[in-house]
């Protein structure tokens, strides 16, 4: 009490703060449990891939025999439950990672669908909704999006109608980004993917996982996503990595 009074904080404010902390105790405990689980998951992946001191040796950038890079990608694949992973410092940000994923999987004549409304502003130039050189639309890829319902949920009838024979890839932005809509849980994304796969089993379901890594004990790749994309600058880098993506 004396410490708070020295800072000019009244007993009433201190009591209010303690009451709020008590109300949030259960929530904080759940967050701590998720963090502990994911820490153990990462450590186990490193053990299974036998990460050792040699993996942290400097690299000339030459592609062959880069043991650290190879094992890092195997660790990521284990953590996210995928067949493989591409994790590189040469990927500068999440938008760069998404651009790589989209351009690698879409050809002229294919169609890209966003069932969660407009994606990040930075992707507009990549897709071509804002005219840009070498965009997907300039390359011959068409694009359509389905807006969310007023309550922020998926418009399933409109999504069903939007999927057609040209739909090659569906991109699902997990984070709300800069929009006034909810951030989707892994469970919600899993339900959406299952719905889409029932309509067109061979469509590629890609999740923009930026800001979503390790906030749950499962990832979108554990509930049907064919590909997840993100940035090392955010959650995976712990706020320390200045660059990188997967």
Predicted regions and their residues:
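Conserved PLP-enzyme active-site core in the AAT-like
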Residues: 3-25, 32, 42-48, 52-55, ...
């Amino acid at each position: 009490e004396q410490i708070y009074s020295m800072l000019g904080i009244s007993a009433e404010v201190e009591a209010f703060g303690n009451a709020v902390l008590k109300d949030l105790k259960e929530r904080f405990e759940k967050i701590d449990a998720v963090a502990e689980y994911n820490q153990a998951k990462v450590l186990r992946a490193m053990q299974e891939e036998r990460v050792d001191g040699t993996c942290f040796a400097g690299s000339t950038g030459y592609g062959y025999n880069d043991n650290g890079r190879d094992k890092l990608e195997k660790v990521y694949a284990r953590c996210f439950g995928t067949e493989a992973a591409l994790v590189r410092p040469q990927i500068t940000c999440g938008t760069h990672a998404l651009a790589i994923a989209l351009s690698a999987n879409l050809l002229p004549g294919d169609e890209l669908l966003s069932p969660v409304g407009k994606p990040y502003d930075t992707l507009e130039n990549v897709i071509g909704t804002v005219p840009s050189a070498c965009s997907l639309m300039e390359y011959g890829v068409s694009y359509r999006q389905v807006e969310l319902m007023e309550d922020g949920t998926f418009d399933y009838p409109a999504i069903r109608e939007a999927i057609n024979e040209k739909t090659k890839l569906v991109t699902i932005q997990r984070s709300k980004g800069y929009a006034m809509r909810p951030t989707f849980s892994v469970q919600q994304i899993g339900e959406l993917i299952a719905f889409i796969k029932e309509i067109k089993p061979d469509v590629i379901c890609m999740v923009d996982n930026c800001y979503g890594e390790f906030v749950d004990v499962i990832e979108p790749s554990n509930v049907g996503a064919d590909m997840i994309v993100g940035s090392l600058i955010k959650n995976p880098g712990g706020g320390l990595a200045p660059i990188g993506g997967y």
